[in-house]
């Protein structure tokens, strides 16, 4: 276990209260909080196994993959409970086929889904079945300069889909947006946050001198309307365990009992190969264990808090007004969070946490290189140019855990500097303040 450079905790170093863990290693995202004991420890380990298990197309336990799919396990995209490198970047952005670590959402230009595809394009399929399509990408690169003359690049992706399983869709009628997985750090703490505190932040998130005004994304799921916290656009009320199994892997469950390719020729091909579609691929109890696993992961403590460079960086973080959106401190509600079956995790309640996010929607601009971070994709109340403030806890360990430093929703930023320089709209003022800093700062 790598314990180097772990400081004695104080102040903001305790990222998640009693769920804070003191690890600086490749398993820093994938380790349970200390309060997981007894029967919950057994369930945590079962959920961990199900999260990483490679699904097969066979009937029965561990099966149900496909017939078409985007990933073969939760861990194939959320490696070590983190985020995998965008595959197409890994191959130089040359248009390489396959995006096992990327999800592509497609629709018509008017927002309607394509009848034969649904909302997610599945580029992989089991033997004997044709994938729905293949994605390729090119990058428009533009060079900019800091005041001291040092240059940086911003790379705007352009996506093309070919090899449609059915009739080709004309580019002028097609809209697509790409995602790489989010880190699963602090999921339980996020679900336990008192929503009234988020609404209070929205009410006071009005800083006209910096152009900042955040708002909640109100979502209705399972007949309940509330403040969305989960997802790039805060478009979900829970961790979407059932949706992930169904939409990403084709694994049917009690909430999504139909195959994702229902109505396509692929489902008939699967039947001819002896696959059964009349039973669910994963039990509700197993999904609840995956949910427990995700909500029980610890959050790495802040590191090197006494390092002079870290202290200077924190000072500049506030001077650049990053904290107006990346809010330092929030609180969890007294009862903790809730699992899929309604069971509460009271250990997550009554905690002071430091996610560095307000979990609100903010306009991230539409003018950098022509489009900024506007993907034209609407999620609930979130418009195309609006994104949830990304929590920053654990972000400094991403390279150690996942082996890369790609950031933003589609991985276009190759490091944190590029991620900051992509900020437009409500992030424009902070970006410009950052740009004026010296290299040391």
Question: What do these predicted regions represent?
Answer:
Residues 19-43, 50-287, 291:
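Extracytoplasmic redox metalloprotein regions
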Residues 65-71, 75, 85-107, 183-187, ...:
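Gly/Gly-Pro-rich "capping" loops immediately C-terminal to redox-active cysteine motifs
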Residues 44, 54, 58, 159, ...:
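Bulky hydrophobic/aromatic packing residues
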Residues 1-18, 22:
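Bacterial Sec-dependent N-terminal signal peptides
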Residues 51-58, 78-85, 188-192, 294-301, ...:
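A generic secondary-structure signal for well-formed alpha-helical elements
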């Amino acid at each position: 276990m790598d314990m180097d450079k772990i400081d004695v905790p104080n102040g903001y170093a305790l990222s998640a209260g009693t769920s804070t863990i003191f690890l600086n290693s490749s398993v820093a995202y994938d380790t349970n909080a200390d309060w997981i004991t007894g029967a919950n420890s057994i369930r945590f380990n079962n959920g961990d196994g199900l999260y990483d298990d490679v699904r097969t197309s066979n009937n029965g336990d561990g099966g149900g993959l496909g017939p078409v799919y985007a990933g073969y396990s939760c861990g194939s995209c959320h490696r070590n409970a983190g985020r995998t490198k965008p595959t197409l970047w890994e191959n130089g952005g040359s248009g390489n086929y396959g995006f096992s670590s990327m999800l592509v959402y497609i629709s018509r230009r008017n927002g309607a889904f394509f009848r034969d595809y649904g909302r997610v394009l599945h580029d992989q399929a089991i033997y004997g079945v044709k994938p729905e399509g293949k994605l390729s990408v090119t990058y428009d690169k533009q060079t900019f300069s800091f005041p001291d003359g040092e240059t940086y690049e911003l790379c705007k992706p352009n996506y093309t889909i070919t090899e449609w399983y059915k009739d080709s869709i004309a580019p002028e009628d097609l809209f697509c947006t790409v995602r790489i997985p989010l880190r699963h750090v602090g999921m339980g703490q996020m679900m336990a946050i008192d929503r009234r505190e988020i609404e209070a932040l929205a009410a006071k998130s009005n800083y006209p001198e910096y152009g900042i005004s955040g708002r909640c994304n109100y979502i209705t799921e399972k007949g309940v309307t509330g403040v969305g916290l989960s997802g790039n656009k805060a478009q979900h009320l829970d961790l979407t365990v059932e949706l992930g199994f169904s939409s990403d892997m084709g694994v049917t469950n009690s909430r999504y009992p139909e195959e994702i390719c229902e109505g396509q020729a692929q489902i008939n091909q699967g039947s001819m190969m002896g696959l059964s579609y009349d039973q669910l691929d994963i039990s509700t109890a197993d999904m609840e264990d995956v949910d427990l696993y995700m909500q029980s992961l610890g959050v790495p403590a802040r590191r090197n808090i006494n390092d002079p460079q870290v202290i200077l960086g924190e000072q500049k973080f506030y001077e650049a007004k990053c904290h107006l959106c990346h809010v330092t401190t929030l609180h969890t509600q007294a009862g903790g969070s809730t699992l899929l079956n309604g069971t509460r995790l009271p250990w997550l309640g009554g905690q002071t946490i430091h996610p560095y996010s307000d979990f609100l929607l903010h306009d991230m601009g539409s003018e950098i290189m022509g489009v900024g971070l506007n993907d034209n994709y609407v999620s609930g109340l979130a418009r195309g140019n609006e994104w949830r403030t990304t929590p920053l806890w654990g972000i400094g360990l991403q390279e150690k855990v996942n082996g890369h430093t790609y950031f933003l929703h589609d991985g276009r930023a190759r490091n944190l500097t590029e991620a900051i320089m992509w900020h437009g709209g409500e992030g424009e003022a902070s970006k410009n303040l950052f740009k004026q800093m010296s290299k040391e700062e």
